Regions:
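Small-residue-rich segments of transmembrane alpha-helices in multi-pass membrane proteins
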Residues: 23-32, 158-173, 219-224, 287-300
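Extended hydrophobic alpha-helices typical of membrane-associated regions
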Residues: 247-307
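Multi-pass membrane catalytic core of lipid/isoprenoid biosynthesis enzymes
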Residues: 79-122, 219-251, 290-294
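Topogenic membrane-insertion module of multi-pass membrane proteins
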Residues: 1-46, 50, 54, 146-151, ...
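Intramembrane alpha-helical segments
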Residues: 87-179
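Functional transmembrane core segments of multi-pass inner-membrane proteins
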Residues: 159-207, 213, 225-229
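Membrane-embedded alpha-helical segments that form the functional core of polytopic membrane enzymes
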Residues: 40-66, 130-137, 182-201
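Acidic (Asp/Glu-rich) catalytic motifs at the cytosolic membrane interface
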Residues: 57-82, 197-219
């Protein structure tokens, strides 16, 4: 920090929270609530606001937990700092002590759990309780021992797909509709797959650091070159699944407009195929996948509102 102006405490905490990445969890939360409205359920704004806040708090807890345990493993000391990967680096730069980050993570998760318990009390049943328990488990044990879900090839990516798709969407749906819905689960899968791809392509940048500390992500297991066909297959599966959901009436016909996002998907794949081993040149592909996830999610959600 010598020769540099130390940022304000507020700026440091904003950086630690990594709020822009909340889109990955808030998108399925909004989608799930809107899907309930699409099926004829009156929209409850208060319950939606609590769902939204609880989801954001869980995401904040997850981000800070990841930073803390990646600090403990040494991973974030080795990962290159990019806009999309490598953690916040606030611990590594001495801006916050690790213990403060851990305490803040616990406080966020406790607050989220409190909101979840209240929503479960209001809505009744056990579905929301189960969804919340799964969410808390993922948020803590994604990088924390003994499970370290994100360190296990394929499992970390699958957890991201399910957690940032069906799990959150079903929870948000249940808060509004107070019943389980397989269509809501199925309809949210494309959003979850795309969020899984955001994580997956980010792993390309960290492949050497992750491998050095025993964090065996799918990209570490396959290598960046062999991971590119996986990226393509997942992109194809996303659009194919969306088409099936529209054809089956699970999503409205307007949701077919997600096809306008195909250029983003194509660009991301072509860029990854060419520059999978070049972190700096790969970055546009990362931004394309992030944009694809946001745009795709927005289109299907707006399609529900207009149908």
């Amino acid at each position: 920090m010598e020769g540099k102006t130390r940022p304000s405490l507020a700026a440091v905490w904003l950086r630690e929270l990594r709020a822009p990445f909340f889109v990955g969890t808030l998108s399925p939360a909004v989608f799930g609530a809107v899907y309930a409205h699409y099926t004829g359920v009156p929209f409850n704004w208060l319950l939606f606001a609590l769902t939204f806040i609880g989801t954001a708090l869980t995401n904040a807890g997850l981000n800070m937990t990841n930073d803390y345990f990646d600090h403990r493993s040494g991973d974030d000391y080795l990962t290159p700092a990019t806009p999309v990967s490598g953690g916040s680096k606030v611990i590594q730069e001495g801006l916050l002590p690790p213990r403060q980050v851990l305490v803040a993570a616990i406080l966020c998760l406790v607050a989220a759990a409190g909101i979840g318990l209240y929503l479960n009390f209001v809505t009744g049943g056990r579905v929301l309780l189960a969804v919340g328990a799964v969410g808390m488990f993922i948020a803590w044990f994604y990088t924390a021992p003994p499970f370290k879900l994100g360190h296990r090839s394929g499992l970390g990516e699958l957890v991201c797909v399910l957690g940032c798709g069906p799990v959150i969407a079903l929870g948000a749906y249940f808060v509004q509709a107070r019943q389980f819905s397989w269509p809501a689960v199925a309809a949210s899968l494309p959003i979850g797959i795309l969020m899984g791809l955001v994580l997956f392509i980010n792993e390309f940048h960290d492949v050497h650091a992750d491998g050095a500390v025993g964090k065996r992500t799918m990209v570490v297991a396959l290598g960046t070159g062999m991971s590119v066909p996986v990226l393509l297959a997942a992109l194809v599966a996303t659009y194919a699944l969306a088409a099936v959901l529209v054809a089956a009436g699970v999503l409205p016909a307007l949701a077919s407009l997600v096809l306008v996002t195909l250029p983003l998907a194509g660009f991301a794949w072509l860029r990854a195929r060419r520059f999978h081993a070049d972190s700096a040149r790969l970055l546009p592909a990362n931004f394309a996948i992030i944009g694809l996830h946001f745009t795709f999610s927005a289109i299907v959600t707006i399609a529900l509102l207009l149908s």
